[in-house]
């Protein structure tokens, strides 16, 4: 672990049977941001975008969870936005929801391995492999999470809610460039989402809109500042929508 | 004797990463195993790999209860009897989840601190021995848990890999009772790491190696 030499105490042997990676005391471990949302809403693309935007200033790594283990990881490796060995896929036993909530062991192992191999890291992005609106990250794994829905899913999705939509640290309404083609009013969709989220942030994003990408990267930078200063408190959107938001029906 | 611990150890919901493991079923299915052959696979594993794993777990528990705790002999004996690298890696990955749980429950327990000294990482039976010591489980109960967990792991993974009536899975396990009892007796009779039986069926090894190179898999091994 040559990268971690600075973490060693003076006089401590660099190699030994009990060598563990220790984060330098003055620096918290990497910020872990989860990216959740239904299949096809652009999670992998968001990861690629964030790597492209931030890898120059931050030391980053990626963990993917997929139903079939390595699809997302292969997509991200081929995107060339991060050294391939910093992108790990975990097996989820066909239970990607379990792997990010009820039993996060495999993901924790992957994050710890990445920190050990390339640490100290600033940011680890974790993509969920869920296939519906209810999969969100446990705070045991992710310090913060963004939830992605897209305009192609229809303007009603934001209003219908669900734990990710109502409680994620950031809600991304993705692929806004497609809105005219699917007859969705982005402004109304954002307003609906904001109402469902009690003041939590909503970001209209398109990979073809650099200004929206800059806002996404700024959100990550802001969370990182809070994480480092110890003022960020991980919150759990929960596995279920809060009852107080269920009055809209469906 | 612990009341709840044996049930915790046998519960597939124990959050130690076991849901990512098919106990060899996914590699076997890829090699052509059919649903009708699952009961035979259960029996085959009970008479081979499970004897080794269960015996190693009992040895590890005994080591965990001695002072000072030294897991090296059982870890090395088990690694030597697990010649396929992907199977050692899978065992170490599963052991890591068990280790994390043991650390959460009793970080200063001598068996838990002894785990941290093992390199490469402790294999699952070694970590289960330590967890058994932390939970105050007897070796018979611990071995029952290992044997049951193997059956349940395969039966549950079958729901993903060769789907059918979930009630069938229960019936397969019940039908394996006599074989499971033999496995327990054999495993508990092993007294020293040197006596640990080397039960590594060549097909299990070959399938594990093939699985390791496969893309789009669901399970670790
Ligand atoms: N038009 C448009 N397409 C996008 C955008 N973001 C992602 N996509 C496309 O949406 C599809 C699914 O994206 P992906 O990132 O794989 O989604 P995931 O399944 O949530 O990881 C791909 O074909 C992407 O190219 C966007 O901002 N605009
Ligand atoms: Mg994806």
UniProtKB/Swiss-Prot annotation, chain A:
GTP binds at residues 37-44. InterPro entries: CobW/HypB/UreG_nucleotide-bd, P-loop_NTPase, UreG. One of its GO terms (biological process) is urea catabolic process. It is found in: Cytoplasm. GO terms for molecular function: GTP binding; GTPase activity; nickel cation binding. The keyword Chaperone applies. SUPFAM superfamilies: P-loop containing nucleoside triphosphate hydrolases (SSF52540). GO terms for cellular component: cytoplasm. Residues 1-24, 230-250 are annotated as: Disordered. Keywords: Chaperone, Cytoplasm, GTP-binding, Nickel insertion, Nucleotide-binding. Its main location: cytoplasm. Residues 7-17 have a biased composition (Low complexity). Facilitates the functional incorporation of the urease nickel metallocenter. This process requires GTP hydrolysis, probably effectuated by UreG. Homodimer. UreD, UreF and UreG form a complex that acts as a GTP-hydrolysis-dependent molecular chaperone, activating the urease apoprotein by helping to assemble the nickel containing metallocenter of UreC. The UreE protein probably delivers the nickel. NCBIfam families: ureG. Belongs to the SIMIBI class G3E GTPase family. UreG subfamily. HAMAP family: UreG. This is Urease accessory protein UreG 3. It comes from Streptomyces griseus subsp. griseus (strain JCM 4626 / CBS 651.72 / NBRC 13350 / KCC S-0626 / ISP 5235).
């Amino acid at each position: 672990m040559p990268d971690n030499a600075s973490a060693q105490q003076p006089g401590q042997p660099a190699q030994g049977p009990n060598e563990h990676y220790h984060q330098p005391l003055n620096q918290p471990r990497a910020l872990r941001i989860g990216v959740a949302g239904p299949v096809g809403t652009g999670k992998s693309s968001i990861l690629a975008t964030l790597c492209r935007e931030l890898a120059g200033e931050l030391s980053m790594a990626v963990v993917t969870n997929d139903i079939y283990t390595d699809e997302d990881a292969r997509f991200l490796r081929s995107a060339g936005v991060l050294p391939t060995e910093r992108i790990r896929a975990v097996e989820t036993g066909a239970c990607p929801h379990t792997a990010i909530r009820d039993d996060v062991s495999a993901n924790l192992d992957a994050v710890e391995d990445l920190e050990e191999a390339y640490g100290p890291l600033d940011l680890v992005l974790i993509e969920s492999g869920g296939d519906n609106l209810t999969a969100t990250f446990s705070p045991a794994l992710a310090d913060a999470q963004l939830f992605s829905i897209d305009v192609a899913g229809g303007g009603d999705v934001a209003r219908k809610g669900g734990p990710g939509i109502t409680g994620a640290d950031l809600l991304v309404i993705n692929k806004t460039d497609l809105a005219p083609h699917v007859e969705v009013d982005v402004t109304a969709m954002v307003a609906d989402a904001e109402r469902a989220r009690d003041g939590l942030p909503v970001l209209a994003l398109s990979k073809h809109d650099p200004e929206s990408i800059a806002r996404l990267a700024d959100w990550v930078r802001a969370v990182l500042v809070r994480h480092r200063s110890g003022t960020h408190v991980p919150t759990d959107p929960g596995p279920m929508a809060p009852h107080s938001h269920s009055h809209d029906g469906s | 004797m612990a009341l709840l611990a044996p049930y915790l150890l046998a519960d597939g919901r124990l959050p130690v990463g076991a849901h990512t493991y098919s106990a060899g079923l996914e590699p076997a299915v890829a090699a052509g195993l059919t649903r009708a052959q699952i009961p035979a696979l259960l029996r085959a594993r009970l008479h081979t790999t499970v004897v080794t794993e269960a015996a190693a777990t009992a040895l590890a528990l005994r080591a965990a209860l001695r002072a000072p705790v030294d897991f090296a002999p059982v870890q090395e004996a088990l690694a030597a009897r697990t010649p396929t690298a992907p199977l050692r890696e899978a065992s170490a990955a599963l052991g890591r989840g068990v280790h994390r749980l043991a650390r959460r429950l009793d970080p200063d327990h001598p068996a838990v601190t002894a785990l941290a000294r093992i390199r490469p990482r402790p294999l699952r039976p070694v970590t289960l021995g330590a967890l058994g010591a932390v939970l105050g489980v007897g070796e018979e109960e611990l071995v029952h848990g290992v044997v049951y967990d193997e059956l349940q792991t395969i039966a549950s993974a079958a729901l993903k890999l060769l789907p059918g009536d979930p009630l069938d899975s229960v019936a397969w396990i019940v039908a394996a009772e006599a074989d499971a009892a033999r496995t327990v007796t054999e495993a508990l009779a092993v007294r020293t790491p040197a006596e640990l039986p080397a039960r590594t069926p060549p097909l299990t090894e070959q399938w594990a190696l093939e699985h390791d190179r496969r893309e789009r898999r669901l399970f670790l091994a």
